[in-house]
Curated annotation (Swiss-Prot):
<comment type="function">
    <text>Interacts with CbpA and inhibits both the DnaJ-like co-chaperone activity and the DNA binding activity of CbpA. Together with CbpA, modulates the activity of the DnaK chaperone system. Does not inhibit the co-chaperone activity of DnaJ.</text>
</comment>
<dbReference type="Pfam" id="PF13591">
    <property type="entry name" value="MerR_2"/>
</dbReference>
<protein>
    <recommendedName>
        <fullName>Chaperone modulatory protein CbpM</fullName>
    </recommendedName>
</protein>
<dbReference type="InterPro" id="IPR022835">
    <property type="entry name" value="CbpM"/>
</dbReference>
<comment type="similarity">
    <text>Belongs to the CbpM family.</text>
</comment>
Length: 101
């Protein structure tokens, strides 16, 4: 029997983990970069990927001077590229099996 551990972070913990202010997190949420559960910032809970995504978003915003809309698009495209690379790798492995036959 396997058990699944679900990690959720509140606003304070996310701010500490990502080293950002609550105002910054609110902006990131407003632009759909991270999506918490809960209606208000006091009730928000974030998944375990939120600190990493938040750090990447802030880095793009600061270092490349992108607006938050641009950050959201860049992160979406980076995720799509990673997904396509994974799919390509899997397909290459499958193709390799057919070629060896």
């Amino acid at each position: 029997m396997s058990s699944t551990l679900i990690v959720q972070l509140d606003m304070r913990t996310l701010c500490q983990e990502a080293d950002v202010t609550a105002e910054c997190v609110i902006e990131i949420v407003e632009h759909g970069i991270v999506e918490p559960s809960g209606r208000t910032p006091e009730d928000w809970l974030f998944d375990d990927q939120a600190p990493l995504v938040t750090k990447r978003a802030v880095k793009l915003h600061q270092e490349l001077e992108l607006e938050w809309e641009g950050v959201a698009l860049a992160l979406e495209l980076l995720q799509e590229v990673q997904q396509l690379r994974s799919e390509n790798s899997m397909l290459k492995q499958r193709l390799g099996r057919f070629i060896q036959l």
